[in-house]
Each structure stands twice: as structure tokens, then as C-alpha cells.
UniProtKB/Swiss-Prot annotation:
Species of the source: Nitratiruptor sp. (strain SB155-2)
InterPro entries membership: HemC, Porphobilin_deaminase_cofac_BS, Porphobilin_deaminase_N, Porphobilinogen_deaminase_C, Porphobilinogen_deaminase_C_sf
Involved pathway(s): Porphyrin-containing compound metabolism; protoporphyrin-IX biosynthesis; coproporphyrinogen-III from 5-aminolevulinate: step 2/4
UniProt protein name: Porphobilinogen deaminase
GO cellular component: cytoplasm
Enzyme Commission identifier(s): 2.5.1.61
Reactions accelerated catalytically: 4 porphobilinogen + H2O = hydroxymethylbilane + 4 NH4(+)
Record-level Gene Ontology MF annotations: hydroxymethylbilane synthase activity
Upper lineage: Bacteria, Pseudomonadati, Campylobacterota, Epsilonproteobacteria, Nautiliales
Top-level EC class as recorded in UniProt: transferase
Keyword presence, Transferase: yes
Amino acid sequence: MKLTIATRGSKLALWQSNHIKAQLESFGYEVELKIFKTKGDKILDTPLALIGGKGLFTKELEDAMLRGEADLAVHSLKDVPTELPEGLVLGAITKREMTNDSLLSEQYETLADLPPNAVVGTTSLRRRMQLLHLRPDICIKDLRGNVDTRINKLKNGEFDAIILAYAGLKRLGILESVRYVHPIDENTMIPAMGQAALGIECRPDVVDVVKKLNDEKSAIETFIERDFIDRLQGGCQVPIGVRASLLENNDIIVKAVIGLPDGSELLKDKIFGSKENYHELGKELAESMIDNGAKELLQRAEAMAFKEHK
């Protein structure tokens, strides 16, 4: 059986797709990659929150599958909207890497070491919100482009520090390319939904093949996170962090944060449960936060994000 994987063309996307290709080949399948450019890849001069719409890094890959040009697509799960197009399913979630965000700098080892007015690069409203809440004295500037481009901007002195996901740095083997790479504690910066996991989207006719790649622990954790986001109706470009952790004793902790992009107002909550009732946890946490004003806070956050970039 021959399979075609739809992928973006960035170094990280190709690493991820080749990683899945190798696993499928170990099961005896013949696999090829087909590269597509997404809307998010083409528009590099505009903050993601202003581009609008969901599926900025997935739609073109999904269209290829629906046309029959590809059988599956490998995504960074955090980029995958909670609602998929009709005719496609999320067939597998791979084992997660460490989910932390990381501070990268040539001069400063930790967030606490950054001087007042330090320039920190990130386009993520979620990271911006949590950074400014902790350090309202620093300056956040937008940072777009692939991982290499972002690191080059840091090394060229455009930024005192930048924030990237630890998982991508590890997968690309570039943890040593910057003097300081400091994973930020998840209680300080809650990750994005699905961060550090790969989501394999596919047509239903190949789901039996794809599900061989599924990691149960990661699938449970990310189900909770995606359900939480879905119930809040929050896309990939709103300031929401959520992290579900399935522990060795089958207990589950889910923590989340919502707030304004300038960090002036944050709403945090957490819930405890077990593997047996994991289907309910995302819903319960979302409803608890909605009762405490989450919907209104998200509306204000969206308005603030658009106003700041006008």
C-alpha cells in the first residue's frame, strides 16, 4: 500500500513528516511526501491574530486530502482547529515531547534576568499575555518566520530574547545553537492546546493505518485540551493556554489561563479528575471559567489585539 503525506515545506514540518514517514515505513508501507504552502506560510508581514480565520497552517493540506492528492497530513497539533472539514478525521496523536515554552537569549538566562525594557520576540498572544503579566516592564515585538529566521533575528541583535516551543528546538537538534535556552515552568507559562504533539489528519479510508501511530496518554491529554478550547470557541490565535497532565497513577490535572494581550488581566483555573472521567474534564473546566467571565474576557482580548495592531 502506497501512502502520500501532505506537508508544509518548513524544516520543522519536514522533520515531523519524515518522522511519521519512517514509522509508517517500519510497518511495511511505501510512503512519499508532497509539499504544499499554506496561507500562514505565505503571509509573513502580518501578526497571525490579524490574518483571521482558522486553519492558517492546515487548510491547503486538508484540501489536498479531500481532492485525493494525499492520504494524510502531519500537523503540529496546536495548529489544528477543533472542527475538522467533513470527510477528514484526526486519526492519531503522537507521543508528546516536553510541552514547555522556552526563553532563548544570547545574554540572559531566565525571564527574571531580563532588564527593564528588554525586547522579547513572539507573535503568540498567549505567550505575550503571560509574559507581560509577569514582567510588565518588558517590550514585546512580533516575531514571524521559521525557526531559523527567528533565531537569526535574535543573533543579529533585533531582540534581547525570543520565545519558542521547546519541542520544535529539540526535534530540529538546535538546542545548542543559542547560548541560553531556558524551559519556562508551566505554572509561569501555560502551553497552547496540543503543544508538542503531532496530529495526524487523514481520510477515513486510511484511519486503520494511521491509528497505529497513536499514543494513548497524549491522545487523552490533548482530547481534554481541544474539548476545552472548543467549548470556549477559541481559535489558535486567541490568548488561551491549557495543559492537561495524565499522571502515572491515572489522576489528571488540567490547568488553563485566559486574559488580555497586555497581561493586565488574567483568569486562571484548574481541575482534578481521573482517566476514567477524562471525557468530562475539558467541559467542566470551560464551564467553570465561563461562569467566572471567560467569554467576556476573550471578547475584550480580541478587541484589544486588533486595536493594538491597527
